[in-house]
Amino acid sequence: MHKIIIDTDPGVDDAIAILLALAAKDEIEVVGITTVNGNVGLHYTTPNACKILTLAGRTDIPVYSGCAKPLEREPLSAEEVHGNDGLGGIGFPDVEKQPEEEFAVDFLVRKARELKGELVLVPIGPLTNLAKAIEKDPEFVNNVKEIVMMGGAEFKGNVTPTAEFNFWVDPEAAKIVFDAGFKKITMVGLDAIDNARMNPALRELLYQIDTPVSKFIYDITRVYVNESWRTEKDLGCRLCDVLAVSQLLDPSVCKVVDAYVDIETKGLCEGTSVVYRKGRYAHVQKVNCQVATYCDTKKFVEVMFGRMFPEYVEVAVQNA
């Protein structure tokens, strides 16, 4: 049983990733959700986390509001991808659930102490909260069991030719995290995510399943598909953050390589994750993470539908 904190900026794909983690209740215990500025501002990401938990019937899980801006930069966002509110602009109603009073960074530090050696962090937004936790508590790094994150890219970015959005929003925070010395980091970046797709057939299947959760996913991904069509003439969409949770559930979903990852914080390529693969570069001796390089699409779909809509997993895999 993985005891996890999801650090997130919901976000269309964040919402689906959270719902997947909640559906895998025999494998994952979500001990809390921390929010951060990213896809949209904190004034949306925190209520969005509360809305997702309400939809899933899991209002018992606490939400903690985190950093409203990057460490050293002004906030950036991606409303064109996620809608003006982060949840596809579908007008999801307000809910009664509210965030806790405790600051997300303090919660991260406290929970890592309480669950020393057990806690898995799943950051699927900018890494500002984690960087702050590292700065706050020298033992935080040692207390965390592992990190499975969505972020970065070895070869090609999505907001610049070289940078992925989460690292680009707060490169200083990403550098702090990769330099900190965590026991295990798995970086699920854009190289693997190319195959973590929801094609039109899978999206139609969600509509036909016709549950509140499946219809919610169908509705919020409309804006995702619109952006994919506008930029790539693709009628599907990549489920970036969902792949990180899938990889936690089944490490065979992605191929990974050992590497040393550094983050560029200045200049033309700021936000770029520079990946030195072990064995490719003779001078590289130190390894600080595993980098996902490829995703098996059918395995990804099997993990996602197998946990969320198990009675439809066979037809989903057939249409992947």
What are these regions (language model features)?
Residues M1, L20-E29, W168-D170, I185-A320:
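Conformational coupling and interaction surfaces
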Residues H2-T8, V12-K51, D85, G91-N195, ...:
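Active-site histidine-anchored catalytic micro-motif
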Residues V40-Y44, N48, L71-E72, A153-K156, ...:
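Short, mixed-charge aromatic SLiMs
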Residues T46-E114, V287-D296, F300, F305-F309, ...:
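Metal-dependent C-N hydrolase catalytic cores
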Residues A56-G57, D137, L249:
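A broad structural signal for alpha-helix termini and local helix breaks/kinks
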Residues V63, V177, V245:
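A residue-level signal for conserved active-site and pocket-lining positions in enzyme catalytic cores
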Residues A68, A78, N84, L127, ...:
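Generic secondary-structure boundary/loop-capping signal
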